[in-house]
């Protein structure tokens, strides 16, 4: 009754594995999941649908703000192949039948994202067949003011381009 025990936190039945886990876990301050952003992390703002009410009926309310894989086909009137001279625009990476491509979207239509103003690495959400030894697609270095559709995931929230290149 007089003993003071530490909380278990993570139960591991094998003492040797428990010892290893505690040694390794102690040094985990920053993990990859703290800088990894899923394919559904970018969203459109309500002002897009206020400025273009015709877009409201192109999909259901649940998916309306998502930068879905078919974003370029769904909302072509607000996405441009060439950057217009007026207003501030962000580059959105996605995919079409022809392969990877980007389009420009007015910055006010994209919700601010944790890595929007930072460097990041863009990776395809799905990549190849999963065969061992298969060569994976070349990742893209995303500069500040670049977002992506659900075709990609992004890793990083870096201040310097070199950090993204080394990721």
Where do the protein language model's features map onto the residues?
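C-terminal substrate-recognition regions of SAM-dependent nucleic acid methyltransferases
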Residues: 1-151, 158-166
């Amino acid at each position: 009754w007089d003993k003071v025990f530490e909380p278990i936190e993570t139960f591991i039945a094998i003492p040797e594995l428990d010892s290893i886990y505690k040694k390794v876990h102690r040094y985990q301050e920053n993990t990859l999941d703290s800088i990894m952003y899923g394919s559904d992390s970018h969203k459109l703002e309500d002002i897009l649908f206020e400025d273009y009410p015709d877009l409201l009926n192109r999909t259901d309310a649940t998916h309306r703000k998502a930068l879905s894989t078919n974003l370029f086909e769904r909302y072509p009137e607000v996405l441009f192949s060439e950057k217009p001279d007026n207003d501030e625009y962000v580059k959105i990476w996605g995919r079409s039948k022809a392969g990877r491509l980007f389009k420009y979207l007015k910055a006010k239509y994209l919700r601010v994202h944790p890595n929007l103003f930072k460097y990041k690495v863009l990776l395809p959400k799905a990549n190849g067949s999963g065969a061992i030894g298969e060569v994976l697609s070349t990742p893209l270095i995303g500069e500040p003011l670049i977002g992506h559709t659900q075709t990609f995931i992004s890793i990083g929230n870096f201040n310097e381009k070199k950090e993204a290149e080394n990721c």
